[in-house]
């Protein structure tokens, strides 16, 4: 069943799964089902593993809810309580609509790149577990420099162009009859994102009203019923939620019209009809064919709507570029139309003129082609080249002569064992070479790999790699000449202290319990103390400068 730390958000009883009665539990991070009379879950799905949910159409005999997983599997739940089946199913559906977006998988390129790096490099994976999983440093700090190094790879560094918004994305919203003289719209997350990017006023209204004043279903129902969606209606209801959005769009359209399109290669004002007078000259009197007001023109509303829709679709891409590149502190307007006015600034104007009069094929290409160094497996470069030692090679004849000489000496050899070593000298030598003898004072350091178990050696290696990574971040902050480095060096000091408490001290206690020498970690402690002394010296000099 649910653990004591899990928060149960909703419990629905009389829910069947494969013709077996049970109860459905919605918790903070997963949905689970337990058979009736059992104290354990037989079905449990994390919200991050759920792709979408589906419900049975209205009028069906069975009130069901289906969960579709990312792996392609499905799970069906049948709400068997006749009196409250629809109400309970809708309650589960509405709660899942709020929970699933929070746990939506982020299957982007950056995450795939991180997974690939961890799978290909076991040392990096172990370092990730020692530092990030144990919460010594954050994941952002761990990946700060590593992703930048891999960005130089030609396969991953190419900037992928984002998919724009289709001009007919609303045409994909095909209403279906629900059998009760009503319409049902099926909205996907892509369509909702396109609506928000095209109409920032709707996104602002969504943030204001959902879920504070109404549910998401009510919001989109009122959106498709509103005058804002049906622009060809003549009158706007007084209680229309989107009346303000239409006014904001009208204001933005007037601003765009007043600014015009400042394209030096195209003059749109010259396309206006200019009738000739009787004397074959341009008449200054306005034509009677265009004397009708906009309100009298039945096509003006739909033309204005098309123009505004096209402008907003184009502006959505510009707003995304400014959000990625622009951190210049310029305020943006509420209606989101501020990006539309910057399309043809002088820099863009010069670029368009240069594009029209220059040809790349005729220009001189003076750029030097360089090849970026890409180390696929860095552990292959940890060891330097082995120096070549001068060796004297013997020929086959030299080897034969040496063998014959040794053979002749061995034939005439007579052993004299009593004159080799006396018994007292042999006894004193054995005593000096025994553990605790005069010649065995430094023997522990030479045989540490034989005295320490393999698991302790492996853990000690992991500690060295982890502390080396932390110290690399620490020493890279010097010289501390920016506010960012000042903040980072103080933060890295706290990370080193956290590593010492959570990793180094438990390891010392472990080897102490096994009656091993605590000198195993003396070098790590020395490196940490050197870093602390460096930070203390920098802080002292900083205080002296301030005083």
From Swiss-Prot:
Q: What is this protein called?
A: General transcription factor IIH subunit 1
Q: Does the keyword DNA damage apply?
A: yes
High-level lineage: Eukaryota, Metazoa, Chordata, Craniata, Vertebrata
List each copy of the BSD domain by range.
99-154, 179-231
Subunit structure, as described in the record: Component of the 7-subunit TFIIH core complex composed of XPB/ERCC3, XPD/ERCC2, GTF2H1, GTF2H2, GTF2H3, GTF2H4 and GTF2H5, which is active in NER. The core complex associates with the 3-subunit CDK-activating kinase (CAK) module composed of CCNH/cyclin H, CDK7 and MNAT1 to form the 10-subunit holoenzyme (holo-TFIIH) active in transcription. Interacts with PUF60.
Q: Where in the cell is it found?
A: Nucleus
Species the sequence originates in? Mus musculus (Mouse)
Pfam families, per the entry = BSD, PH_TFIIH
Keywords tagged on the record:
Acetylation, DNA damage, DNA repair, Nucleus, Phosphoprotein, Repeat, Transcription, Transcription regulation
Could you tell me the Gene Ontology terms of the biological process aspect for this record?
A: cellular response to leukemia inhibitory factor; nucleotide-excision repair; transcription by RNA polymerase II
Cellular-component GO terms for this entry: nucleus; transcription factor TFIIH core complex; transcription factor TFIIH holo complex
**Do you know which InterPro entries this protein is assigned to?**
BSD_dom, BSD_dom_sf, PH-like_dom_sf, Tfb1/GTF2H1, TFIIH_BTF_p62_N
Residues that the record marks as modified (Phosphoserine) are 338, 356
Disulfide bond annotation, renumbered to this chain = none
């Amino acid at each position: 069943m649910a653990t004591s730390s899990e928060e149960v958000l909703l419990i629905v009883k009389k829910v069947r799964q494969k013709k077996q009665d049970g109860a459905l539990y919605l918790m903070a991070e997963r949905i689970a089902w337990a058979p009736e009379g059992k104290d354990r879950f037989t079905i449990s799905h994390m919200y991050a593993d759920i792709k979408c949910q589906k419900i049975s159409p209205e009028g069906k005999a069975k009130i069901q809810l289906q969960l579709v997983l990312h792996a392609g599997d499905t799970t069906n739940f049948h709400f068997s309580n006749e009196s409250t089946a629809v109400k309970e199913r809708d309650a589960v559906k509405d709660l899942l609509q709020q929970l699933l977006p929070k746990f939506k998988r982020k299957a982007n390129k950056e995450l795939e790149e991180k997974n690939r790096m961890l799978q290909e490099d076991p040392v990096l994976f172990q370092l990730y577990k020692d530092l990030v999983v144990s919460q010594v440093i954050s994941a952002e700090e761990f990946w700060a420099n590593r992703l930048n190094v891999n960005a130089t790879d030609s396969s991953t560094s190419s900037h992928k162009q984002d998919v724009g918004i289709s001009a007919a994305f609303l045409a994909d919203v095909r209403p279906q009859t629900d059998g009760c003289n009503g319409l049902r719209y099926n909205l996907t997350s892509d369509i909702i994102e396109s609506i928000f990017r095209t109409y920032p006023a709707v996104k602002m209204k969504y943030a204001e009203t959902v879920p504070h004043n109404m549910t998401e279903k009510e919001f989109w129902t009122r959106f498709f019923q509103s005058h804002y969606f049906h622009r060809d209606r003549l009158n706007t209801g007084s209680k229309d939620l989107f009346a303000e959005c239409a006014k904001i769009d009208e204001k933005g359209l007037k601003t765009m019209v007043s600014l015009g399109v400042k394209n030096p290669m195209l003059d749109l004002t010259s396309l206006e009809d200019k009738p000739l007078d009787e004397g074959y000259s341009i008449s200054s009197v306005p034509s009677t064919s265009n004397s009708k007001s906009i309100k009298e023109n039945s096509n003006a509303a739909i033309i204005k709507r098309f123009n505004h829709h096209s402008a907003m679709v184009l502006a959505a891409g510009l707003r995304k570029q400014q959000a990625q590149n622009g951190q210049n502190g310029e305020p943006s307007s509420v209606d989101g139309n501020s990006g539309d006015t910057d399309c043809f600034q002088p820099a863009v104007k010069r670029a368009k003129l240069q594009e029209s009069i220059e040809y790349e094929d005729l220009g001189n290409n003076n750029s030097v082609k360089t090849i970026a160094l890409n180390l696929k497996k860095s552990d292959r470069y940890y060891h330097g080249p082995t120096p070549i030692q001068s060796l004297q090679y013997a020929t086959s004849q030299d080897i034969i002569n040496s063998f014959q000489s040794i053979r002749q000496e061995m034939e005439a050899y007579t052993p004299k064992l009593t004159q080799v070593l006396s018994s007292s000298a042999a006894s004193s030598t054995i005593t000096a070479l025994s553990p605790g003898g005069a010649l065995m004072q430094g023997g522990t350091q030479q045989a540490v790999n034989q005295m320490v178990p393999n698991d302790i050696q492996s853990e000690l290696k992991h500690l060295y790699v982890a502390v080396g990574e932390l110290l690399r971040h620490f020493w890279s902050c010097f010289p501390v000449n920016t506010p960012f480095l000042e903040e980072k060096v103080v933060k890295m000091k706290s990370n080193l202290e956290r590593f010492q408490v959570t990793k180094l001290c438990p390891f010392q206690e472990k080897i102490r319990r096994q009656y091993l020498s605590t000198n195993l970690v003396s070098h790590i402690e020395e490196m940490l103390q050197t870093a602390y002394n460096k930070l203390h010296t920098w802080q002292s000099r900083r205080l002296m400068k301030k005083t």
